[in-house]
Regions:
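Class I SAM-dependent transferase core
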Residues: 2-64, 100-117
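Residue-level signal for inorganic ion chemistry
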Residues: 26, 83, 165, 208
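Conserved SAM/SAH cofactor-binding pocket of Class I
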Residues: 42, 53-142, 148-149
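Short alpha-helix immediately C-terminal to the canonical SAM-binding loop
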Residues: 101-103, 169, 173
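Helix-to-beta-strand junctions that scaffold the AdoMet/dcAdoMet cofactor pocket
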Residues: 155-156
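Glycine-centered, small-residue-biased loops immediately flanking beta-strands
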Residues: 159
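Short strand-turn motif at the edge of the Rossmann-like AdoMet-binding core
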Residues: 164-168, 192
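SAM/dcSAM-binding transferase cores
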Residues: 174-230
Length: 230
């Protein structure tokens, strides 16, 4: 099944053993804490790992060679773990507020020997990393205007944020215009791709660039971010 990663421009041959190890570790662990709803290897790869690694479409297009990446709401490890497996030169901080999921991420990093993966158990709006990261990512957390406020304060000016979205992305982009203006950022690209599932499942990476410093008032407290999104 790993040959499907060639569609994303990835050479998987040197990474297949580590991916297999992670997938089995994930399935075994998920029986304990229910990381995803459907526990089988093929679905895990096609729905979650392949989707996570679509990041390479952005990475190649924008010639990203290295840097520090903050993944917001890493949960069961997507996209953080597959990215850490494939991209040795990207140092990844995986943030999540659920202790049992951070425990899983720490054990996954140790099991796979991932020196470039650093799990952190904190709420996104409470992270102590203002303007420290070159890159950001978020998958399956919230609507775009919400996750932008969670993520952009932690990026350096000129940094890129990648949001994994369905093809309803255009509506989310429209609703995020106030947030983009307030946070001094803009959507610069939308990269579409298709998951290798039996049914057609199209997705999009929304690429956001931070153009200037984020005002100090952001991110606001979590209750405000959710109840009164920008």
């Amino acid at each position: 099944m790993f040959e499907k990663l060639e569609n994303l421009g990835l050479d998987y041959k040197n990474k297949s053993a580590m991916l297999e190890k992670f997938m089995q570790f994930f399935i075994d662990y998920s029986r304990k804490i229910n990381l995803i709803s459907r526990n089988d290897i093929e679905f895990l790869f096609e729905k979650h790992i392949y989707d996570s690694l679509s990041f390479n479409l952005f990475k190649e297009k924008y010639n990203i060679k290295s840097g520090r990446l903050l993944d917001i709401g890493s949960g069961g490890g997507f996209p953080a773990v597959p990215l850490a497996v494939f991209f040795d030169d990207i140092d990844i901080t995986a943030a999540d507020s659920t202790e049992k999921k951070i425990k899983f991420l720490k054990e996954a990093a140790e099991t796979l020997g991932l020196k470039n993966l650093h799990p952190v158990c904190r709420r996104a709006e409470e992270l102590p990393f203002k303007a420290e990261f070159d890159l950001g990512s978020c998958r399956a957390v919230s609507e775009l205007r919400v996750i932008l406020e969670y993520a952009l304060p932690y990026l350096k000016t000129g940094g890129f944020f990648t949001a994994y979205k369905s093809l309803k992305a255009e509506e989310e982009i429209k609703n995020a215009q106030n947030a983009l203006k307030a946070l001094n950022a803009e959507v610069i690209d939308r990269i579409e791709y298709t998951l290798p599932l039996e049914e057609t499942h199209k997705r999009a990476l929304i690429i956001v660039r931070k153009n200037a410093d984020t005002p100090e008032i952001y991110p606001r407290k979590n209750g405000i971010i959710l109840k009164k999104p920008l």
